[in-house]
């Protein structure tokens, strides 16, 4: 029992190095380093470089591209270098330091000739011995790594590649999601037991190896302990050893991690996986593990060689000249090179890039408000010229106040804003919102797309239930969609007819004899379909939609808003009346919409339309777990239209006029259109006027938004008909880049809309409404930071990781991806399960980046004490800031910006 508890504890702690990977059909953004944020970004970067040779800093090409495009100010970098050197004193001639810095900051690689020089070996051996005697700081410690990583096979590749191939084969068999007609035997017992049963008959193992498998214990924890003992791994190194195996195939391990969280009977799935993997490693390594007992020492020796070569190359000091110095001087030189290694300068380039963006964002906001100040009547501005003379940035807040007051007065008179449209904070809504506001008396609002509703949706047109909220939060309620019984029966029959046709096709394709006949039967139809889809993608897509609407038309549906008893549900179905009032109040507060209601309030979810795109869920709403957010929007709108809810809100101080109506639309991000999801049958006259005004303005809004978006796509030249071109991109099944998604996301602004209204933020900013003056205890701000801001950071770091380390954290080229086991994509048939974003999602061309890999900048419009209180109360967020996983900036009531570093 002690052993079992110890192994389970080791595995539980080792999970930190991977992230749960959901199936591609419900793809949700994940921060690949969420479990490592207790350490600093820099420490994790160093550790990943040591254990997997993965570099998570932007490389030389990305840095040079950023400088060339004006995204990175070299003077900022040079100042950072100067400041760093002033913090330390080195007993080294200044000209050597200058040469070293001037050379290494270019990020040039050290030529192999320097590494192979005999003098470098001599110096490295000398320093290694001295560091062992003195326990010097420069001694570089390496964690123990899997034995199979240290052994090279006859083909010249690490033996771990053979282990990986075995694990990919077995994991694919176990995970398979309804694609194979013949599933893995005994999988219902466990992954480990199914493998034990089958591996005894697997002739890729020798007869002796199969005998070893036959004698393995039935308990996976005992098996793991046995292998670790066999390899003479010290108990304090168990976790590092297990982490090495999880990182070998983080995609497949991540998928198993996800499944272990979803189903009680699979909660020990990672334990099964590791037991199998360690056994396979033991079988393939054999007795060769005895030859790698000094692996850590040899890696340290190699590190010394690299550091010596770096000093000689960057300082322009030949190795024979280095040997002429005494050992203490040599140690000083090498200590300097170790301290000022290339990763340090990559980190400085990254910080300079982020500081440049921060500066450019501040200038945009200031410039935007200076132009507003010029347009405002001087009597509306609440300060005098003399007051501003010594406060150059104070125009920012005062202009915001003036605009706030101006809008509020006009709203109360009923002559200003016709419609208020609440969009998801998604960066793609920023340009669309800007064009809507420019088109008429419309106000836009930013809120997370799940609208504060912690629900699991059960939609009539979806096969499975879906958690429609951020993935880090479990659902608390289930909401069912239903329709009239007769309509529902007809719809179900139509669904069954369609699904039976597809099931028959799949059954024939996956069975030996029928699959031989299938090309003859389906060939003519599929050939015609291929030709039509290729030549006329937009028309064929439209025709298909018309056919679908005719033969599988979704009936008019309602939602289970009120609490219902359902013994089959593990979650409460629907809400009580008080819960409806509470959720409506919370959502309105999060939207900063508790007064001055327009006659027509639209809650706009968002969705993306693309064809033949396995990663379509990555373009959906991240706050809804990789699904469209129209369902949540409809639920909230229906709640807010209820008289009893409005009465309850009135008692809480929120009065919604009787003439105000809530409706629901969906922003289609791939075509920049607004599709109506729910509009009440009865509209007040002023609400109807607002509805018609918005509809009339939409064609022009879509054209402007599409033109702006299409100009950024690399395969587009001059666009004469942007709306038609956008629809073609969304319909074309050969299009690898129907839209950019959330690429180039860089900041998250929490504040009043007037802070950024009219400013072109280039579709790079998440915008969330917030007024600190209405949030006395900071609860709303903490909610925004703990939910929407966290989702934004996960999205940001997934894009970041897929750009800086695409081979490890990306998913490769879309054109060569293979959808595997119904859960994800691979490159070829023997790769890891790729769990990041594709190359086309972050790069414009082979050597031209599109996404700028910088960490998220969170901007809060509030006084310093409000931000300080947030950091004191929210340790999780404070740790992200202090450990450099994101950047934090605030703007106070005087309009002054502050960076919280």
From Swiss-Prot:
The protein's matches in InterPro entries, at most eight in alphabetical order, are given as:
DabA (IPR018752)
Keyword presence, Secreted: no
GO MF terms held by the record: zinc ion binding
> Is-annotated flag, keyword Membrane?
yes
Q: How does this protein sit in the membrane?
A: Peripheral membrane protein
Mainly localized where? membrane
Where located? Cell membrane
Q: Which UniProt keywords apply?
A: Cell membrane, Membrane, Metal-binding, Transport, Zinc
Biological function: Part of an energy-coupled inorganic carbon pump.
**PANTHER family, A to Z:** INORGANIC CARBON TRANSPORTER SUBUNIT DABA-RELATED, UPF0753 PROTEIN AQ_863
Q: How does it assemble?
A: Forms a complex with DabB.
Q: Which family does it belong to?
A: Belongs to the inorganic carbon transporter (TC 9.A.2) DabA family.
Name of the protein this chain belongs to? Probable inorganic carbon transporter subunit DabA
Name the gene for this chain: dabA
């Amino acid at each position: 029992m002690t052993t079992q508890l110890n192994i389970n504890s080791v595995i539980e702690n080792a999970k930190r190095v991977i992230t749960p990977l959901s199936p591609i059909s419900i793809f949700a953004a994940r921060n690949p380093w969420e479990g490592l944020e207790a350490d600093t970004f820099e420490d994790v970067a160093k550790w990943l470089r040591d254990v997997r040779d993965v570099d998570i800093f932007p490389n030389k090409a990305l840095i040079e591209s950023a400088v060339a495009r004006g995204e990175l100010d070299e003077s900022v970098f040079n100042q950072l270098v100067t400041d760093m050197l002033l913090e330390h004193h080195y007993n080294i001639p200044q000209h050597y330091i200058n040469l070293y810095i001037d050379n290494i900051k270019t990020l040039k690689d050290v030529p192999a000739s320097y590494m192979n020089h005999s003098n470098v070996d001599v110096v490295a051996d000398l320093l290694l011995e001295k560091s062992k005697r003195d326990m010097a700081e420069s001694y570089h410690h390496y964690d123990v790594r899997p034995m199979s990583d240290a052994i090279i096979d006859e083909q010249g590749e690490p033996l771990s590649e053979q282990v990986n191939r075995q694990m990919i084969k077995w994991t694919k068999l176990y995970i398979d999601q309804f694609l194979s007609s013949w599933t893995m035997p005994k999988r219902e017992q466990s992954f480990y037991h199914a493998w034990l049963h089958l591996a005894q008959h697997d002739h890729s193992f020798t007869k002796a190896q199969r005998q070893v498998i036959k004698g393995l214990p039935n308990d996976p924890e005992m098996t793991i302990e046995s292998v670790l003992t066999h390899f003479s791994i010290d108990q304090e190194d168990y976790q590092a050893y297990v982490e090495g195996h999880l990182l070998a195939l983080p995609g497949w391990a991540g998928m198993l991690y996800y499944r272990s969280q979803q189903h009680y009977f699979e909660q020990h799935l990672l334990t099964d996986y590791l037991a199998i993997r360690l056994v396979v490693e033991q079988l393939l390594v054999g007795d060769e593990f005895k030859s790698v007992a000094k692996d850590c020492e040899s890696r340290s020796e190699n590190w010394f060689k690299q550091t010596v070569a770096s000093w000689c190359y960057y300082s322009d000091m030949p190795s024979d000249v280095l040997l002429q110095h005494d050992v203490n001087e040599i140690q000083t030189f090498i200590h300097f090179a170790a301290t000022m290694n290339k990763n340090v300068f990559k980190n400085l380039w990254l910080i300079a890039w982020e500081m440049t963006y921060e500066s450019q964002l501040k200038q945009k906001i200031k410039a935007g408000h200076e132009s507003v100040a010029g347009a405002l009547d001087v009597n509306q501005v609440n300060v005098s010229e003399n007051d501003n003379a010594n406060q150059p940035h104070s125009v920012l807040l005062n202009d915001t106040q003036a605009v706030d007051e101006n809008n509020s007065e006009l709203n109360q008179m009923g002559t200003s804003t016709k419609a208020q449209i609440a969009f998801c904070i998604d960066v793609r809504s920023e340009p669309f919102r800007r064009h809507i506001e420019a088109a008429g008396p419309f106000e836009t609002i930013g809120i997370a797309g799940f609208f504060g509703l912690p629900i699991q949706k059960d939609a009539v047109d979806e096969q499975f239930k879906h958690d429609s909220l951020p993935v880090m939060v479990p659902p608390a309620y289930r909401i069912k969609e239903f329709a009239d019984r007769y309509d529902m029966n007809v719809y179900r029959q139509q669904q069954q007819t369609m699904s039976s046709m597809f099931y028959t096709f799949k059954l024939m394709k996956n069975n030996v004899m029928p699959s031989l006949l299938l090309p003859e039967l389906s060939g003519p139809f599929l050939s015609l379909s291929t030709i039509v889809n290729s030549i006329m993608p937009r028309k064929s897509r439209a025709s298909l939609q018309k056919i679908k609407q005719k033969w599988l038309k979704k009936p008019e549906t309602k939602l289970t808003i009120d609490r219902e008893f359902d013994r089959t549900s593990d979650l409460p179905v629907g809400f009580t009346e008080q819960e409806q009032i509470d959720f409506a109040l919370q959502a309105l507060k999060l939207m900063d919409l508790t007064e001055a209601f327009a006659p027509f309030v639209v809650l706009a979810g968002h969705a993306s339309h693309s064809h033949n795109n396995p990663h379509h869920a990555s373009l959906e709403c991240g706050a809804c777990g990789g699904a469209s957010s129209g369902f949540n929007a409809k639920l909230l709108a229906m709640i807010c239209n209820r008289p009893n809810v409005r009465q309850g809100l009135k008692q809480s101080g929120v009065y919604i006029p009787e003439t105000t109506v809530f409706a629901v639309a969906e922003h289609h991000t791939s075509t920049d259109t607004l599709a109506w999801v729910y509009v009440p049958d009865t509209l007040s006259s002023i609400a109807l006027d607002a509805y018609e005004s918005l509809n009339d303005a939409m064609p022009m809004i879509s054209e402007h938004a599409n033109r702006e978006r299409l100009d950024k796509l690399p395969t587009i030249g001059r666009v004469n008909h942007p709306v038609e071109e956008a629809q073609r991109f969304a319909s074309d099944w050969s299009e690898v880049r129907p839209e950019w998604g959330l690429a180039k996301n860089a900041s998250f602004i929490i504040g009043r809309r007037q802070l950024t209204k009219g400013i072109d933020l280039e579709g790079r900013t998440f915008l969330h409404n917030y007024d600190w003056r209405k949030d006395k205890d900071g609860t709303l701000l903490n909610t925004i930071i703990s939910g929407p801001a966290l989702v934004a950071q996960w999205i940001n770091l997934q894009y970041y990781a897929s750009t800086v380390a695409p081979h490890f954290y990306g998913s490769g080229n879309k054109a060569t991806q293979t959808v595997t086991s119904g859960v994800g994509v691979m490159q070829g048939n023997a790769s890891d399960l790729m769990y990041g974003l594709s190359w086309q999602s972050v790069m414009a061309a082979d050597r031209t980046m599109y996404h700028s890999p910088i960490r998220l900048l969170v901007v809060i419009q509030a006084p310093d004490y409000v931000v300080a209180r947030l950091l004191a109360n929210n340790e999780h967020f404070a740790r992200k800031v202090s450990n450099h996983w994101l950047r934090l900036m605030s703007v106070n009531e005087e309009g002054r910006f502050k960076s919280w570093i």
